[in-house]
């Protein structure tokens, strides 16, 4: 994995900018996305560019291994590293698919109503999957139950019947960049709002809703 990876990011003005990552930095980005996706209660912004770059790097590694001497200890080490990367990548993608299936109407609605300058939640492939899952669910409900009900009961609002992600769930996090004046909202009427600072390297247990913007910006890492 000697090749560098090119990622397209966005600057503060919303314009695309190219980010050059070393292979080690690329895998670190993948692992961060994997951990955040595993522990966040909602579906996060898709990282399709990271996924594509990692897959390209795996192809380069396979080509390099084909040219390496058989029996070389380095070959075995690289093969184990490739399997580890494949595991992280497949686990990340499976986690996203599970969330899409679990929250599909809410995910599609959020994707539909997001502003143009906001990053997409779903990759093009995930969007197709979510729409097909929605259509198949509606067809199944209609064929197995709804068509046998009175006309006034033959419609179902999936946004109301399918549970939403629990944004008030508590998550463990590690602070990557110091944050000041984080507003913590009360959990009941007897409490008041208060403000805290999050020191770099510190770990906390907090409500996801409070730190969701920091997860999106990369300022904190879910653990």
UniProtKB/Swiss-Prot annotation:
The keyword DNA damage does not apply. Its main location: nucleus. One of its GO terms (biological process) is double-strand break repair via break-induced replication. Keywords: Acetylation, Chromosome, DNA replication, Nucleus, Phosphoprotein. Residues 166-223 are annotated as: Important for GINS complex assembly. InterPro entries: GINS_A, GINS_bundle-like_dom_sf, GINS_Sld5, SLD5_C, Sld5_GINS_A. The modification Phosphoserine is found at residues 12, 16. The modification N-acetylmethionine is found at residue 1. This is DNA replication complex GINS protein SLD5. It comes from Bos taurus. The lineage of its organism: Eukaryota, Metazoa, Chordata, Craniata, Vertebrata. The gene is GINS4.
């Amino acid at each position: 994995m000697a090749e560098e990876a090119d990622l397209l990011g966005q600057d503060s003005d919303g314009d695309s900018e190219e980010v050059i990552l070393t292979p080690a930095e690329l895998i670190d980005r993948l692992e961060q996305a994997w951990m955040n996706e595993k522990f966040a209660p909602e579906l996060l912004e898709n990282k399709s560019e990271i996924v594509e770059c990692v897959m390209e790097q795996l192809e380069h590694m396979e080509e390099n291994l084909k040219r390496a001497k058989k029996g070389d200890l380095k070959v075995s080490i690289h093969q184990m590293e490739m399997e580890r990367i494949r595991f992280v990548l497949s686990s990340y993608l499976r986690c996203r698919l599970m969330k899409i299936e679990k929250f599909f109407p809410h995910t599609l609605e959020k994707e539909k109503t997001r502003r143009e300058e906001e990053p997409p939640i779903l990759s093009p492939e995930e969007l197709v999957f979510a729409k097909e899952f929605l259509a198949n669910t509606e067809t199944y409900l209609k064929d197995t139950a709804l068509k046998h009900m009175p006309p006034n009961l033959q419609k179902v609002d999936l946004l109301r019947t399918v549970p939403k992600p629990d944004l008030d769930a508590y998550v463990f996090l590690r602070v990557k960049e110091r944050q000041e004046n984080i507003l913590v909202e009360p959990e009941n009427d007897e409490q008041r709002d208060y403000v805290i600072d999050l020191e770099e390297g510190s770990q906390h247990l907090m409500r996801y809703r409070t730190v969701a913007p920091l997860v999106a910006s990369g300022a904190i890492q879910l653990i």
